Regions:
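Flexible glycine/proline-rich, aromatic-decorated loop/lid segments
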Residues: 60-79, 88-89, 253-264
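Hydrophobic packing residues within well-ordered alpha-helices of enzyme cores
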Residues: 5-8, 36, 57-58, 114, ...
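Conserved PLP cofactor-binding pocket of PLP-dependent enzymes
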Residues: 161-181
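Active-site PLP-lysine loop of aminotransferase-like
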Residues: 48-50, 73-79, 88-105, 127, ...
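Extended, hydrophobic alpha-helical segments in both membrane/secreted and soluble proteins
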Residues: 1-12, 29-33, 42-44, 53, ...
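Conserved C-terminal structural/oligomerization subdomain of aldehyde/semialdehyde dehydrogenase
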Residues: 16-17, 41-42, 46, 89-92, ...
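Adenylate-forming
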Residues: 55, 82-87, 100-101, 204-208
Length: 501
């Protein structure tokens, strides 16, 4: 990895990036990473790695604010239990790609036949020096990773789970195995999806069998893991595709194709829940996350430019913004709030789906959906209503502290709005479930809130902090992005080609 990074830096410098703008500091993450993220001069962190380390990074920067008094941005892309509801991509790069298949879910009727073919394919794999074109599987990253993977395999064996390992025997390869950190491709059969509690980052594929009538329960189990990076489904039945894509909580979903190799601008990549903070790499929201200031309409202008070339479906947006319309009508005697409702409603993009460019035989879409619940903290009525308007504009629910100010507002608001609000005791409100935070107040209160949010277990939650009276809330921080890539050729071809005359 350091050699690849060094080559990448060399290419950037050759392309004209000024010396000193980008720096390469190779070393152990525990030392170099901790030193960098702990430095007050660092104004943003982009991280790819484990969920546990991402959580530590969030806690490390939680007490710091930037020059504008805002929390330090953290973009974390982490791993997860990637499932495929029927593929054999698990062993590419020795299973060390963040979207590599971890759990293969096979319908009972095809399980035995598929496993027989998979075991045969594993036995034909060559494991050795990745510098040779004849090598199928290289080493894992280091001895610690090898030990962790082998410990997991042994644990599964001790539980009585069927474990199959195979690799093509070759004397030249065998000599390299003795000195390298190699793990033979491994197949482990599980009784239940929930048996796998954390990601195994290596050439290990777990298999779960399911009854065709239990597909909804299987998807619920996958969602319940809390991870949501990638999911694949192989089926020729449109109803099954709709069922999986409509209920799975994952950032990238693939239909009738492999799950690795996302392309910038075609399949924006990144997970949700325990698998990442967003925004998606290769998507239009990413660079905006790194800006300290920007025009409020900047994102809308960017998306409008894209919409001029590719169609956008905004049917869901109308349903999501009905509570916002009710708030706008209620604010007839509050012109400032009414104007904000109009502004947020025009800027909001939740409930939109966009067709992305891609190769013939493949359909790629990018959908923006609202986060489920947003914690809103303010000690002023106008700020509380500003936060409410922003959250309703994207279609999320609101979590308010149960105090006099917010109780009175709930009573005064129309039912279409108040039913989108939940109250919780202020002293333990950060223990409640929520997906994002909007705060108005002073910097000391903001630091304390960031530290409390960072101390939570589970998914990393970002905090937007503002001074009292500010209304430039970033709506894109309240979205969930989902990318769907469908191999249309597998279902009979690309019908759009018939329109070419």
């Amino acid at each position: 990895a350091p050699l690849i990074a060094a080559q990448g830096i060399a290419i950037l410098l050759e392309a004209g990036v000024p010396p000193g703008v980008v720096q390469l500091l190779p070393g152990q993450g525990e030392t170099v990473g901790a030193q960098l993220t702990g430095d007050d001069r660092v104004r943003g962190v982009m991280f790819t790695g484990s969920t546990e380390v991402a959580t530590l990074l969030q806690r490390n920067i939680a007490s710091r604010l930037d020059a504008q008094g805002r929390p330090i941005p953290l973009i974390a892309e982490t791993g997860g239990m990637k499932a495929m509801i029927v593929d054999s991509s698990a062993f590419d790069s020795a299973g060390q790609r963040c979207s590599a298949l971890r759990v293969l879910c096979l319908q009972d009727e095809i399980a035995d036949h598929t496993l027989k073919m998979l075991r045969g394919a594993m036995a034909e794999c060559r494991m050795g020096n990745p510098g040779r074109l004849t090598t199928d599987i290289g080493p894992v990253i280091d001895s610690e990773a090898k030990a962790n993977i082998e410990r997991h395999i042994q644990t599964m064996r001790s539980k009585g789970r069927p474990v199959f390992q195979a690799v093509r025997e070759n004397s030249e390869d065998a000599r390299e195995w003795q000195s390298g950190t190699f793990v033979a491709p491994t197949l482990i059969e599980l009784d239940d999806f929930a048996e796998l509690q954390k990601e195994v980052f290596g050439p290990v594929l777990h298999v779960v069998r399911y009854n065709r009538n239990q597909l909804p329960e299987l998807i619920e189990q996958i969602n319940a893991s809390g991870y949501g990076l990638t999911l694949g489904v192989h089926t020729r039945i449109d109803e099954t595709i709709a069922q999986v894509t409509g209920s799975a909580h994952v950032g990238n979903l693939y239909v009738n194709r492999n799950m690795v190799g996302a392309v910038v601008g075609v399949q924006p990549f990144g997970g949700e829940g325990l698998s990442g903070t967003g925004p998606k790499a290769g998507g239009p929201l990413y660079l905006y996350r790194l800006l300290a200031n920007r025009p409020e309409s900047a994102l809308a202008v960017t998306l409008a430019r894209q919409d001029a070339e590719y169609p956008v479906d905004a049917q869901l947006k109308a349903a999501l913004t009905q509570p916002l319309n009710a708030l706008r009508e209620w604010a007839a005697n509050r012109p400032e709030l009414q104007a904000l409702c109009t502004q947020y409603g025009e800027l909001a993009q939740a409930g939109t789906q966009r067709l992305l460019p891609g190769p013939t035989g493949e359909r790629n879409t990018w959908t923006l959906l609202p986060r489920e619940r947003v914690l809103c903290i303010a000690d002023d009525e106008q700020d509380a209503l500003t936060q409410l308007a922003a959250v309703l504009a994207v279609g999320s629910q609101v979590l308010w502290p149960d105090d006099t100010l917010h109780r009175q507002l709930v009573k005064a608001l129309p039912s279409a709005v108040s039913e989108r609000i939940q109250l919780a005791k202020a002293e333990n409100i950060t223990a409640q479930p929520f997906d994002a935070v909007i705060f108005h107040g002073d910097s000391d209160q903001l630091r304390a809130l960031c530290e409390a949010v960072a101390a939570r277990d589970g998914a990393i939650v970002s905090v937007q902090g503002f001074a009292r009276g500010e209304s430039n809330i970033l709506l894109e921080r309240l979205y969930i992005e989902r990318s769907l890539s469908v191999n249309t050729a597998a279902a009979g071809g690309n019908a759009s080609l018939m329109t070419i005359g």
